[in-house]
Design a protein with these regions (language model features):
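Membrane-integral, polyisoprenol-dependent glycosyltransferases
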Residues: 1-128
Length: 128
């Protein structure tokens, strides 16, 4: 078998296992954890308003989001301390799967897997 074909089969196999491991039980726990209290909400408002909007008090809004309610934002702009790329990537998952724990974690799992695949291919290229 051709060495190039084998290397791609190994890369795809490792990438597939990595993706399955990342997606397995991704939605647990279903509540907002640590920085998730900021980024998924900012991504959701960017998806719907085009900019980061403000939300109500996290102690009342976060349980509502975990329960499936995603309309607690206001039209007021949020104070932004980070560039928008990460929130734009999170909004892809939210667009596909809704404002759910799986939705706001999906992009991180997908791009984390792509980094593994790219690292394998880069190592292969550099070590030939």
């Amino acid at each position: 078998m051709d060495d190039g074909l084998v290397s791609w089969l190994v890369t795809i196999s490792i990438g597939g296992v990595a993706l399955i491991m990342r997606l397995w039980n991704l939605s647990y726990p279903s509540k907002l954890l640590f920085d998730e209290t900021y980024y998924p909400k900012d991504a959701w408002t960017m998806l719907h308003q085009g900019y980061e909007g403000t939300w109500g008090d996290a102690k009342t809004i976060n349980p509502q989001i975990a329960a499936g309610t995603s309309n607690g934002w206001t039209p007021d702009a949020e104070f932004v301390v980070h560039p928008p790329l990460g929130k734009e990537l999170i909004s892809i998952g939210e667009h596909l799967f809704g404002m759910t724990s799986f939705g706001w974690r999906f992009s991180s799992a997908l791009f984390g897997t792509l980094m593994i695949v790219l690292t394998i291919r880069l190592a292969r290229r550099l070590s030939r």
